Design a protein with these regions (language model features):
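Conserved structural motif at the start of ABC-family nucleotide-binding domains
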Residues: 5, 20-22
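The feature captures the beta-strand-to-loop junction immediately N-terminal to the Walker
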Residues: 23, 36-38
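Helix-to-loop junction immediately C-terminal to a conserved catalytic motif
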Residues: 51
Length: 153
């Protein structure tokens, strides 16, 4: 197995409560992994740590050098006055200008059921917003795709 992520003895504590302790996991190239558990067990926290958006309190996280990681958070942030297309492009990050990127974003949004990319986000449902965020994450290639509750709406 060609390991792209190695987690050893990972710890996270919130206000004197250990969320997880001595957690270990190895993710190989091409593997799929699902975290399943009850609320409050640290699944989202572990994913934020993997994505580099939060730091562990102990242990070791080794990510293969140059690994392209794309992360869809559980609660993506929206600017209510922006359009679905603008939100998708903003969430895509990186180089998002140009006709090719805009066309690809529109195609991806349509494939995910967002058929009116010029509507303001404030008029959209939670599920539509989640699909817009997913399109933004999928717009650029990634070696590791981290999706935190991508279908919870």
């Amino acid at each position: 197995m060609n390991t792209i992520v190695s987690i050893e003895h990972l710890e996270k504590v919130y206000t004197a409560r250990k969320l997880f302790d001595d957690t270990a996991c190895y993710i190989g190239e091409g593997e799929k992994l699902a975290l399943i558990g009850v609320n409050g067990t640290g699944k989202s926290t572990l994913l934020r740590i993997l994505a580099g958006e939060e730091s562990p309190d102990g242990g070791e996280l080794i990510v293969r050098k140059g690994l392209q990681i794309r992360f869809l958070s559980q609660n993506p942030k929206f600017c209510e006055d922006e359009t679905a297309l603008a939100a998708c492009l903003r969430m895509a990050g990186g180089e998002v200008s140009g006709e090719d990127t805009t066309a690809a974003a529109k195609k991806l949004l349509a494939a995910l059921g967002v058929t009116e990319p010029d509507l303001a986000c404030e008029t959209l449902s939670g599920g539509e917003k989640k699909r817009i965020a997913l399109a933004g994450v999928l717009l650029h290639p990634a070696d590791l795709l981290i999706l935190d509750e991508p279908t919870n709406h």
